[in-house]
Regions:
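Walker B catalytic acidic pair
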Residues: 67
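Active-site-proximal or metal-binding-adjacent scaffold patches in catalytic folds
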Residues: 1-62, 71-82
Length: 82
């Protein structure tokens, strides 16, 4: 997928979940072993650039939403049930 399209999608989803208001941002990183990351201390959600370039829209959106869920519940939750 085009990185500019992924950026627009991520920005839209962050805005939709009111994370932009809280200072959260989206960017790409160079990760090789994971798709996405939620960094609470930086208020930043990232996707691996290589992942974003090769995956389809549905998978990318799902990954961004997964990281947004982490941002919304906070650092103490990890992958447990809320």
């Amino acid at each position: 997928m085009e990185l500019s399209s992924v950026q627009l999608l991520a920005d839209h989803l962050l805005n939709e979940h009111e994370l932009f208001k809280k200072g959260w941002r989206f960017s790409f990183d160079r990760a090789k072993r994971r798709a996405g990351c939620c960094r609470y201390s930086k208020k930043e959600i990232t996707l691996a650039k290589a992942y974003a370039e090769q995956e389809e829209l549905k998978e990318i959106k799902n990954t961004i939403l997964h990281e947004i869920a982490h941002a919304l519940v906070g650092p103490k939750h990890g992958h447990n049930v809320i």
